[in-house]
């Protein structure tokens, strides 16, 4: 017995061959994430004073708690407000996350709403301009103080 196998040519009927041909798909241009030497997050800056004012407006008891407990309560109120806004942003952009960015861009470390990062594979896509505008409108953050950009991420492993 021979263990040698010979390849056989396969021929299709002309009608079958035409139905098997693949059709080209439209090419979608993907947004490219720039290369950085350190962990960065594409985020919308949420200014501390603005977030504190929103927290006080949403819940008048916040001011009383701040008077009793001081700066720690202010920080907690701002973090809670940013978390709520992040949840709203997730309705439009599911990859949204809270991120703490480096103080070299602001006068203190700042909580931001992250939309993409250069550290995690699942967060490497960027929202479209239309999605960004929807997020800004939904969160009412259209002012110049809500800057969008690539910021140094202080704790990249905490927002997976």
Descriptions of predicted regions:
Residues 71-125:
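Short, intrinsically disordered low-complexity segments
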């Amino acid at each position: 017995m021979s263990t040698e196998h010979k390849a056989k040519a396969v021929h299709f009927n002309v009608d079958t061959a035409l139905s098997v041909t693949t059709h080209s798909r439209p090419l979608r241009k993907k947004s490219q994430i720039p290369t950085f030497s350190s962990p960065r997050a594409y985020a919308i800056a949420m200014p501390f004073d603005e977030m504190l004012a929103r927290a006080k407006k949403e819940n008048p008891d916040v001011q009383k708690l701040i008077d009793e407990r001081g700066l720690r309560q202010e920080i907690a109120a701002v973090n809670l407000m940013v978390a709520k806004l992040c949840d709203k942003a997730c309705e439009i952009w599911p990859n949204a996350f809270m991120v703490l960015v480096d103080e070299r861009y602001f006068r203190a470390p700042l909580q931001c709403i992250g939309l993409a990062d250069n550290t995690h594979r699942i967060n490497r896509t960027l929202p479209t301009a239309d999605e960004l505008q929807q997020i800004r409108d939904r969160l009412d953050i259209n002012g110049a103080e809500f800057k969008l950009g690539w910021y140094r991420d202080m704790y990249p492993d905490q927002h997976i």
